[in-house]
């Protein structure tokens, strides 16, 4: 969806001290988690070098958050561990993500109040493309901001500044919610209101955060 508004329309929501136009939501640990069984499915390919394999996969993931192809990086990992199976067999997309439907319903409720909502997440290109194409997020969010597309990753200032440029609002009118303290600090450094979210805290954790800004679910 675009972010154009009718001339003169004011959709800000907030308390006397803070007026918000946008809420940015992190994905993993806030709106979604790894699907049950995914880790077991992945590590079965690397026994008995499971720990070493997981470290290599994690390193490939981090190296690709700002645009490098994760598929190419992972195929190199598979060669190193002498895994002959194709990548899409080793990493089954069906096991990647389990969305928290109550949290998505809460995002809809926030939008119904007149606020714009965006996904703001660090993702490598394969996982990010899967999220964009397969989870229906285009019907939930006004915008989706993936690090692999922006060329910056949280907590870099460039990540948050690029989003501010895209949505064309002052940072003081934006709330960012993330489960990693470093990312929250990065948002605050450029003037965004940042709130730390307890991992998989659900709507019970989201409601009081929003209430501090005058947004009632």
Describe the function of each predicted region.
Residues 37-41, 56-59, 72-76, 105, ...:
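Alpha-helical elements of Rossmann-like donor-binding domains used by nucleotide-donor carbohydrate transfer enzymes
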Residues 9-58, 189:
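Active-site neighborhood of HAD-like aspartate-dependent phosphohydrolases
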Residues 47-57, 81-92, 215-217:
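Short, surface-exposed acidic
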Residues 48, 83, 115, 169, ...:
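Short glycine/serine/threonine/alanine-rich loop segments
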Residues 90-117, 157:
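Short, acidic loop-to-helix structural element flanking the phosphoryl-transfer center
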Residues 45-48, 81, 198-203:
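Hydrophobic/basic alpha-helical segments enriched in Actinobacteria
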Residues 2-23, 120, 124-217:
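Asp-based, Mg2+/Mn2+-dependent phosphohydrolase catalytic module
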Residues 62-90:
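A metal-dependent, Asp-based hydrolase signature
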């Amino acid at each position: 969806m675009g972010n154009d508004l009718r001339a003169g329309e004011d959709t800000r929501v907030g308390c006397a001290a803070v007026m918000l136009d946008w809420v940015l939501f992190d994905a993993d640990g806030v709106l979604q988690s790894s699907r049950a069984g995914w880790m077991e499915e992945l590590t079965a390919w690397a026994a008995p070098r499971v720990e070493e394999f997981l470290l290599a996969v994690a390193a490939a993931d981090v190296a690709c958050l700002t645009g490098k192809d994760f598929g190419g990086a992972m195929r190199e990992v598979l060669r190193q561990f002498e895994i002959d199976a194709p990548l899409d067999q080793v990493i089954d997309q069906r096991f990647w993500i389990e969305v928290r439907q109550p949290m998505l319903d809460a995002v809809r409720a926030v939008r119904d109040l007149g606020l714009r909502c965006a996904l703001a997440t660090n993702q490598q290109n394969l996982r990010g493309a899967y999220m964009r194409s397969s989870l229906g997020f285009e019907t939930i969010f006004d915008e989706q901001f993936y690090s692999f597309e922006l060329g910056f990753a949280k907590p870099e200032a460039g990540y948050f500044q690029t989003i501010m440029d895209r949505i064309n609002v002052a940072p003081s009118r934006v709330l960012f919610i993330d489960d990693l303290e470093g990312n929250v600090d990065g948002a605050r450094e450029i003037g965004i209101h940042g709130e730390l979210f307890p991992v998989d805290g659900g709507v019970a954790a989201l409601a009081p955060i929003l209430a501090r800004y005058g947004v009632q679910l």
